[in-house]
Amino acid sequence: MNASNLLVELFVEELPPKALQKLGDAFAGVLFEQLKAQGLLASSEARLTAYASPRRLAAHITEVLPQAEDKAVSQKLMPVSVGLDADGKPTPALIKKLAALGAGEEAVAGLTRQGEGKAEALFHSSTVRGVMLADGVQKALDEAIAKLPIPKVMRYQLADGWSSVHFVRPAHGLVVLHGTEVLIGVKALGLTAGTATHGHRFEAAVDPVVIRSADDYAAQLREEGAVIASFAERRAEIARQLQAAAERLGGGVRPIEDEALLDEVTALVERPNVLVCEFEKEFLDVPQECLILTMKANQKYFPLLDAAGKLTHQFLVVSNISPQDASAVIGGNERVVRPRLADAKFFFDQDRKKTLASRVEGLGKVVYHNKLGTQGERVERVRSIAKSIARQLGDTGLAQQADLAAQLAKTDLVTDMVGEFPELQGTMGRYYALNDGLDVAVADAIEDHYKPRFAGDELPRGNAGVVVALADKLETLVGMFGIGNLPTGDRDPFALRRHALGVIRMLVEKDLALDLETLLVSVLPAFGDKIEDATPQLADFIYDRLAGNLREQGFSAQEVDSVLALRPQRLSDVQKRLEAVRAFGELPEAPALAAANKRVGNILKKADQAVQAQVDAAVLAEVAEKDLYAALQSVAPKAQQQFAAGDYTASLQTLAALRAPVDAFFEHVMVNAEDPALKANRLGLLATLHEAMNRVADLSRLAA
């Protein structure tokens, strides 16, 4: 059978722009996988191309067969003893089973036997006719539509009195072509497959666009319909035009980089045309973050930055039309953006009439959580925690700076600008703090206390920012855990996982001399009797986040488990411990010592009572135990010294010298001796060994 390429296009009204790419990939992907599962692809070389524009979802699939190949099927029926009587004739049960398969009694002669003895069974062989392409596409199309990731569907009628159709947007056309042939009878959403689609609403050369063949689809839409059907091609064209427009302006200007905005604009236009617009320079007195946000979020414009990263008074618009005279389009966009910028300027001017300090009282009217009080109460807790952290770091001056920053950190929440643009919280606080004449370190801390906001985000710039950011995140974590408001599954409305990672990153990357569990407990007094003490559960939660983060960095699960099993309190030490464990794992002595360490741990766990790491040299009897004791006396102090100095790699490598005496001990010494004094002394020797071996990590976790 000759294979041809297949095209399936669903023509619809404008799709949700933020979901377009996902919808396009899902639609095409399910079609491809369904056809593959039905055996309708001629080879493993078949390729899929997904198309997605504001008004269409389509898939082009190569090497599609007109009919799947027939299949020989062998089906087990029943044991021979059940299907045939003593004379070898078919039983009623066998006749009934064959009838269910559409076969008569004459099929008995063609049955085969497989197996031996009681396991011998009868098998019926038949040929299953391969599915026809039209039927296969119908099934695949139904599945693709059913599985589209649509958060909300519309209900509509194709004509008055017709039954309702449910889909993300009303559909108006269906094209299904196998080569040049329409697959007759394929239907979807009340539509029947044909060859006609539609191009650009205003600039198509012909309407409808009649697709000649599956392979002509993209080219015909571009030439006759003025549509770039491929999402990727359209995106690349927009990026190219944005860069070209900026270069024509000169002066080193460049469009702001925003991948999400580029994706959204790609989903809004079918044939992009980038135009240069501008606004009055007086608006540049407003913080550029405000102007950039309103242009991007509200208007989908691309602001232009100069070589120094400062906002210019020009911006780029991606239009869906390409008139000979674009002045009307440019003027319209400039008129639309002007009121937005004027609002931002008004908010900025009004907000600066009040100091941040005068807004603190207003936070008492903003509810934070019904069990944890208002933002005003929360601010007082963060202040208390920040001062406690600064004291633990031994810096009185830092405590004063952090206290002021913590007091004012949330005050921009009650400003007009942040009320309009919540994304600017912290950013506007910094601008208003500088306007009030506050120290730059305090202003930076106000902005930075939200950092890191996401994975890979930068950390606070100064020490005050780090202290307030830590205090803010710890207040959230301890408070939420204390009222039992824990993340479950995908639900994490208070971003506790992100806050935990933020705490980890600051403790590690800023190399803070703070013990984790001491730090968590120090937060509790700020809450009084509002919450339960859930710091043990919170510590587990943080260690779990740390473990996941370390595995993502490339450390093995065994390496991570070995270090975190000891629950090291200085998280800034964890990386060094892991590097030491990795270096130790490369030593030839490592496997034997890890296995021995595991054995020692098991022996000590099974001891009748708690074993102290004490050895009486006079009680030692066997040569092997004396040798191990002597080796420990020689090696352990040096390893302990290196550990105390933070040289974990050297400490573990020093301990590698214990391999031979440890092996000899287990080969020649009976730990559970009949003499109680001898047994206790040997257990004490093993406890001493265990203590020496497990300062950096629990090496037993490295055992195979």
Swiss-Prot record:
One Pfam family for this entry, by name? DALR_1
Q: Does the keyword Aminoacyl-tRNA synthetase apply?
A: yes
Places the protein is found: Cytoplasm
Extract the InterPro entries matched here: DALR_anticod-bd, Gly-tRNA-synth_bsu, Gly-tRNA-synth_heterodimer
EC nos: 6.1.1.14
> One GO biological process from the UniProt record?
arginyl-tRNA aminoacylation
Does the UniProt entry include the keyword Nucleotide-binding?
A: yes
Q: Which reaction does it catalyse?
A: tRNA(Gly) + glycine + ATP = glycyl-tRNA(Gly) + AMP + diphosphate
Query: What molecular functions are annotated in GO for this chain?
Result: arginine-tRNA ligase activity; ATP binding; glycine-tRNA ligase activity
* Keywords carried by this UniProt record: Aminoacyl-tRNA synthetase, ATP-binding, Cytoplasm, Ligase, Nucleotide-binding, Protein biosynthesis
Gene Ontology cellular-component terms listed: cytosol
Q: How does it assemble?
A: Tetramer of two alpha and two beta subunits.
Question: Cross-referenced PANTHER family, in alphabetical order?
Answer: GLYCINE--TRNA LIGASE, CHLOROPLASTIC_MITOCHONDRIAL 2, GLYCYL-TRNA SYNTHETASE
As for family, the record states:
Belongs to the class-II aminoacyl-tRNA synthetase family.
| This protein's name | Glycine--tRNA ligase beta subunit
| Record lineage | Bacteria, Pseudomonadati, Pseudomonadota, Betaproteobacteria, Burkholderiales
